[in-house]
Amino acid sequence: VSDSLRHRLRALPDFPDRLPAFDPALAPKDPVELFLAWFENALAVGVPQPHAFSLATATAEAVVSSRMLILKNIEPAASGAAAGVDFGAWQFASTRGSRKGRELGINPRAAMNFYWAGLGRQVRVVGEVSLLSAEASALDWEQRPGADGRVNPDWQLYELHPAEVEFWQASADRHHIRHRYVL
C-alpha cells in the first residue's frame, strides 16, 4: 500500500499550470492591504470559501491542534499607528468551551493559514489572541446566517493581533516566493 500510495501521490499535480505573478518589491507596506488584494483576486477567480482558514492552537504542554474557521473581519491598524507597528486585528469566533476556546484560554498564541490552491497562494498570520467584549460576541452570534434569535452566552468573538504575516506564492520552477512582515 505504501509504495502504491507514494506513486499515486507523486503523480498528482502540485499546482495549477498558470500561477499569478508576485513581485515582493512591489508589495505595499501594510500586510492587510496585500491580503485584501489577494483575497479579492481569490474571489474574482472563484476560489471556494476564500475566507476560510486553518487556525492552529496549542495546549500549555505544546500539544498542537488545528481546525477550519471563517474570517469574520479585519479591523484596521489603530489610527495614528506608525507603519509596521500594527497589522490590524483579524477576527474569528467560536464557543469558549470548544477545544480551541480552552486552548486559547491557556495559551493565547495562534496561527491562521489561508490557502488558495487554485492560485498557488497561502497567507500565514501569527500572533496573540484576545477576547472581544460580550456585546461584540453577542452581536456576532445574532448576525450569523440562520440566526434564530436564541442567545448563546458561550459564543466568543476573538481577534488575532499579528506579530508576523507571511505571503507565499507558488512558482512552477519550484522557486517559491515568500514575503514576510514582522513586527
Task: Report the location of each language-model feature.
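Short beta-strand or tight-loop elements
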Residues: H51-F53, R67, P108, Q156, ...
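Charged, gly/pro-rich active-site loop segments
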Residues: S2-L26, R121-L183
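A short mixed-secondary-structure module that forms the rim of ligand-binding clefts
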Residues: L71-L119
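An N-terminal domain-cap segment
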Residues: L19-A82
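Tryptophan-centric aromatic hotspots in well-structured domains and transmembrane helices
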Residues: A37-W38, W90-F92, W116, P153-Y158, ...
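Amphipathic alpha-helical interface surfaces
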Residues: P31, R67, K100-E103, S137
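A generic structural motif
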Residues: A56-A60, K72-I74, N113-A117, W168-A170, ...
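Short aromatic-glycine-enriched beta-strand elements
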Residues: H51, W90, I177
